[in-house]
């Protein structure tokens, strides 16, 4: 480590993926010597060394890179990360930093504490698609095993311009069940509903009011993404089933109020929703107005 806040050597496992490339880009800009350990073994970014291999079964070159690293970033799916932890615990030097980028933190945090107690460990979850850019966007940070290396890495990410939000693993998963699992489920269900209604999207687009246009845009973005990423968010988060069930119950309550012709109950739902938003309602309403101004 150089200067106590800048790492000398880093291995990004799964560097060829979008998240791995984003971290690699910023690490290289910070003067860090970055090595990718990736099964693809090709398509490296500028300034990055590539070692082809599987982190679960690393060859001699991969072992040497991992052993020399100040920090290892696991930008891989959860099943791979789960197996890799024990391997890395036996290869990385004591006190080095292991950072995962998984979208669910409770399980991997427990795994790290159990299988890699000698490593400093932190979970980093960029709460945005890497293509949007990091500047000003939130990165959730779950400190598993604290130490100077973890502090240096968190400070480094903040120095890149990210808005780092630290929280415990359980809290992270509770929040992302609402932020990601419920949100994605609502948008996907909206799209499935459009398909069932057999409506022409072009006609919808031509006369769409801002809320509908925003939903169409969200649907297009998610549907154009990688299914495995969205499946992992729905399947791995322990709070996702409850989030989907809550959405379903909300639709039932809405439908019941309308079908019964009960305007008082319908109005009460609006009052309930204003209570959910609380003191943040006015600010979020202004944000929505700015978003809608840009939609046309």
UniProtKB/Swiss-Prot annotation:
Instruction: State which residue ranges cross the membrane.
Output: none
Q: What InterPro entries does the database record attribute to this sequence?
A: 6-PGluconate_DH-like_C_sf, NAD(P)-bd_dom_sf, PDH_C, PDH_N, Preph/Arog_dehydrog, Prephen_DH
Give a yes or no for keyword Oxidoreductase in this entry. yes
Q: What class of enzyme is it?
A: oxidoreductase
Task: List the keywords (alphabetical).
Answer: Antibiotic biosynthesis, Oxidoreductase
Gene3D superfamilies, alphabetized: 6-phosphogluconate dehydrogenase C-terminal like domain (1.10.3660.10), NAD(P)-binding Rossmann-like Domain (3.40.50.720)
Q: Oxidoreductase: present as a keyword of the record?
A: yes
Q: One of this protein's GO BP terms? A: tyrosine biosynthetic process
Domain (Prephenate/arogenate dehydrogenase) spans: 9-288
**UniProt-listed Enzyme Commission number(s):** 1.3.1.121
* Highest taxon in the source lineage: Bacteria
Describe which pathway this protein belongs to, using the record's wording.
Answer: Antibiotic biosynthesis
Give any GO molecular function from the UniProt entry. NAD+ binding
Leader peptide range in chain numbering: none
Pfam (any one) = PDH_N
SUPFAM superfamilies in alphabetical order = 6-phosphogluconate dehydrogenase C-terminal domain-like, NAD(P)-binding Rossmann-fold domains
Q: Per its database record, what is this protein's job?
A: Involved in pristinamycin I biosynthesis. Probably catalyzes the formation of 3-(4-aminophenyl)pyruvate from 4-amino-4-deoxyprephenate.
Q: What family does the Swiss-Prot or TrEMBL record give for this protein? A: Belongs to the prephenate/arogenate dehydrogenase family.
The molecule here is called 4-amino-4-deoxyprephenate dehydrogenase
Which species does this protein come from? Answer: Streptomyces pristinaespiralis
Its gene name is papC
């Amino acid at each position: 480590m150089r200067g106590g806040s800048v790492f000398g050597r880093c291995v990004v496992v799964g560097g060829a993926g979008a998240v791995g490339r984003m971290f690699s880009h910023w690490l290289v800009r910070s003067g860090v010597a970055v090595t990718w350990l990736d099964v693809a073994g090709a398509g490296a970014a500028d300034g990055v060394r590539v070692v082809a291999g599987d982190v679960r079964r690393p060859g001699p070159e991969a072992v040497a890179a991992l052993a020399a690293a100040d920090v290892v970033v696991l930008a891989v799916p959860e099943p791979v990360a789960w197996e890799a932890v024990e391997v890395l615990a036996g290869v990385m030097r004591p006190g080095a930093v292991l950072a995962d980028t998984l979208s669910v933190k409770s399980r991997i945090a427990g795994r790290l504490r159990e299988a890699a107690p000698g490593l400093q460990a932190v979970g980093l979850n960029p709460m945005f698609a890497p293509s949007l850019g990091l500047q000003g966007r939130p990165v959730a940070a779950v400190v598993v095993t604290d130490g100077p290396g973890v502090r240096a890495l968190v400070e480094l990410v903040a120095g890149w311009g990210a808005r780092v939000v630290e929280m415990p693993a359980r809290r992270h998963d509770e929040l992302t069940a609402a932020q990601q699992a419920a949100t994605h489920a609502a948008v996907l269900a909206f799209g499935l509903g459009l398909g069932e209604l057999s409506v022409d999207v072009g006609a919808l687009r031509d006369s769409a009011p801002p809320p509908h246009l925003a939903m169409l845009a969200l649907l297009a973005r998610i549907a154009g993404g990688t299914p495995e990423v969205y499946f992992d968010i729905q399947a791995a988060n322990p709070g996702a089933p409850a989030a989907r069930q809550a959405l379903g119950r909300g639709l039932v309550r809405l439908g019941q109020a309308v079908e019964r012709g009960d305007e008082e109950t319908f109005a009460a739902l609006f009052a309930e929703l204003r209570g959910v938003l609380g003191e943040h309602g006015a600010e979020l309403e202004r944000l929505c107005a700015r978003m809608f101004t840009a939609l046309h």
